[in-house]
Amino acid sequence: MAITASMVKELRDTTGAGMMDAKKALTETDGDMDAAVDWLRTKGLAKAAKKSGRTAAEGLVAVAVSGSTGVAVEVNSETDFVGKNAEFQEMVAGIAQVALGADDTEALLAADMGGKSVADTVTAKVATIGENMGVRRMAKLEGDIVVSYVHNAAADGMGKIGVLIATKGGDAGFAKQVAMHVAAVNPASLDEASVDPEMVEKERQVQIDIARESGKPEQVIEKMIVGRMKKYLSEITLVNQAFVVNPDLTVGEAAKEASAEITGFVRLEVGEGIEKKVENFAEEVAKTAKG
């Protein structure tokens, strides 16, 4: 496969690797972007990084909460300009309200919204606004306490990132702080028990390859892997992450102090999969939560 300059740039943006290293990684992996990231990590040339996808969507994520139920819905548009359009925002807010009564995206698209289906409503809006758009996905969360948070809000209840948090015990104020944390840190799972086993095994193999590159004895490598996997799991699971509001505590420890149990979370980001550089994002959210 021919390795293009744009592929090299994408890999460099994702991993921070040098130009020649990025090109070699792509050559060694026949242009497979995800495999190239792992190749660079194995060689110690890149930090663990989320793989950048190919989604190029704009639009908004809207959140809505009613009692013990919360929903987050992503509605895409072709340009960011449409996301600022009041007519588009009104439609997105309405779709989020309808989503409270839907079980999944398919049901949402078929649900009634002012006398016609959500799908037909969106189609009509395409004709009015003159730009392609669509409901990409929805997620639902239930719990004793459910709160929502929107980061980079474009209007009330909608923005670029939408988060839902469900807790048992505690109060809405603490749950809101956890929602801000999730927006900033983007955990993969709630706890170790809910982590995808395939993801863990893939990371374990990468760490084994990295350790073997060091040339250390196998028994030393085994101990290294145990420590590295423990660190990895603490970084990707919500309850084990350092709380952005108070980094001296993990989120789980903070929940215990607040007499709360976090039972679930949802985080949707517009165009999920695109790697976007946001400087001091966690610091920004921590200040907002404290303020």
UniProtKB/Swiss-Prot annotation:
GO terms for molecular function: translation elongation factor activity. This is Elongation factor Ts. GO terms for cellular component: cytoplasm. Keywords: Cytoplasm, Elongation factor, Protein biosynthesis. It comes from Jannaschia sp. (strain CCS1). It holds the Pfam family EF_TS. Residues 79-82 are annotated as: Involved in Mg(2+) ion dislocation from EF-Tu. Belongs to the EF-Ts family. NCBIfam families: tsf (TIGR00116). PANTHER family: ELONGATION FACTOR TS, ELONGATION FACTOR TS, MITOCHONDRIAL. Associates with the EF-Tu.GDP complex and induces the exchange of GDP to GTP. It remains bound to the aminoacyl-tRNA.EF-Tu.GTP complex up to the GTP hydrolysis stage on the ribosome. It is found in: Cytoplasm.
